[in-house]
């Protein structure tokens, strides 16, 4: 099922300089030279059906130096989530046309699992729109439920945006869960909020809770937003084109540029002209922007008739959110079309790929319960550097100055094999019915698909030659 509501978000920050002592360069050190204070945020609330809930773009820029932008972001986001829940908390009755009725009567396969239908055939419909979706097994229909979470997607949430507002999640009631990558970075974190209350049959008040799940699009597409945007066709920018058109749209069909290091305090917002090209220098990357990028920024300022840097700031963050929405919505469409899976249900690409593999191959993996079997398989796992090197080679070919036509023609070719793990995983792999072999089967092991643990007789004269890597795995 496509997750009905998804939020795409982004923050921008002032980069305040920090006065500090020079570090001892004879030792390893981390130098803090900037403090990032949020200057504004923007998010797009995207529904799977624009007719019942048109896209909602929310943007807030700091208006006073002491405003708490992260707190405003959290409070406003929670209020919109509560509003969405209460608008759609009651299931819509199914709307069946004559065509839908005929389709349901003649259906022979479940539209969810694609399996053959029997006596448990039921009608499946969308509880938000009331539209008929197809015939399904009763069990499939019961599991095909609207999720109890709302994904909020940032690009590079783990590395940047999460540090700006995660503390503010604790200022309101609700449990917070996280999936940590390490002490500083999180794969995802979730804030539970109360969206409604009702009185049960015993007369006791009951709270209805939903999760706001923050996930990182970088965990699915590990490239810069600029790179991801460049891979899309013009027709793919449906969210951007719903807000801009003509020359303005053409200017925004790429990632913009922003003078991060120059943008150091609240007063920069009231600047009445674009800063010079030198102001776009990045201390972090030690790079300047190109002349082409600066001309693009100047044209954006002119075409959008900007008066202050606040206008430029607002457009920059807004376009980033719309571009992210278009990139991830296209990614969702591709995954749904090819695998029938929505990435918005997942935390990372490996989790999505794992479910896609199980679904496409229809393999049921057997759980190993024999400890000895598990240990034996673990012993056979090898990894690390994989290479085959020739210590000495002499070429002889027409492209060489010292080519000898009387000798065999020889070339020295460097081969680089990529994705060895992926290649191995695409080969036939054991999945089930694991058992120990009998003595008779071991004698004729070549006739059975098997994993062998053996003792090797390794002549001493081969030890140095096969030192790295050894011919067989060492138990």
Protein language model regions, located:
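Metal-dependent nucleotidyl/phosphoryl-transfer cores and adjacent nucleic-acid-binding surfaces
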Residues: 1-475
């Amino acid at each position: 099922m496509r997750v009905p509501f998804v939020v795409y978000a982004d923050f921008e920050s002032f980069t305040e300089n920090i006065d500090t002592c020079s570090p001892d360069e004879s030792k390893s050190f981390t130098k803090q030279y900037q403090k990032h204070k949020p200057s504004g945020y923007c998010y797009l609330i995207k529904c799977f059906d624009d007719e019942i809930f048109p896209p909602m773009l929310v943007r807030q820029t700091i208006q006073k130096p002491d405003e708490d932008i992260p707190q405003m972001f959290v409070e406003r986001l929670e209020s919109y989530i509560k509003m969405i829940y209460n608008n759609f908390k009651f299931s819509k009755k199914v709307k069946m046309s004559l065509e839908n009725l005929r389709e349901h009567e003649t259906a022979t396969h479940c539209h969810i699992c694609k399996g053959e239908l029997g006596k448990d055939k039921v009608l499946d419909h969308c509880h938000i729109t009331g539209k008929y979706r197809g015939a399904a097994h009763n069990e499939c229909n019961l599991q095909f439920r609207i999720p109890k979470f709302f994904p909020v997607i940032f690009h590079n949430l783990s590395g940047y945006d999460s540090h700006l507002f995660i503390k503010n999640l604790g200022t309101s009631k609700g449990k917070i869960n996280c999936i940590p990558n390490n002490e500083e970075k999180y794969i995802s974190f979730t804030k539970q909020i109360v969206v409604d209350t009702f009185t049960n049959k015993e007369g006791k008040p009951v709270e209805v809770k939903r999760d706001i799940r923050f996930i990182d699009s970088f965990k699915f597409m590990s490239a810069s937003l600029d790179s991801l945007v460049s891979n899309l066709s013009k027709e793919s920018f449906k969210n951007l084109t719903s807000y801009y058109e003509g020359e303005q749209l053409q200017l925004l069909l790429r990632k913009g540029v922003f003078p991060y290091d120059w943008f150091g305090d609240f007063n920069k917002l009231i600047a009445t002209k674009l800063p010079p090209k030198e102001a776009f220098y990045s201390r972090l990357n030690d790079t300047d922007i190109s002349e082409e990028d600066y001309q693009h920024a100047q044209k954006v300022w002119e075409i959008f008739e900007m008066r202050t840097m606040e206008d430029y700031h607002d457009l920059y963050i807004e376009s980033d959110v719309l571009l992210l929405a278009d990139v991830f919505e296209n990614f969702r469409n591709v995954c749904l079309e090819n695998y029938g899976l929505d990435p918005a249900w997942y935390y990372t690409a490996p989790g999505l790929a794992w479910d896609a593999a199980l679904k496409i191959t229809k393999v049921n993996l057997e759980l190993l319960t024999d400890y000895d079997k598990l240990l034996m398989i673990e012993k056979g796992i090898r990894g690390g550097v994989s290479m085959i090197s020739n210590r000495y080679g002499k070429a002889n070919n027409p492209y060489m100055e010292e080519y000898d036509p009387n000798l065999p023609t020889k070339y020295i070719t460097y081969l680089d094999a990529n994705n060895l793990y992926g290649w191995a995983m695409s080969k036939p792999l054991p999945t089930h019915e694991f058992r120990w072999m009998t003595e008779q089967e071991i004698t004729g092991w070549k006739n059975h698909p098997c994993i062998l643990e053996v003792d090797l007789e390794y002549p001493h004269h081969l030890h140095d030659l096969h030192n790295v890597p050894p011919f067989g795995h060492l138990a």
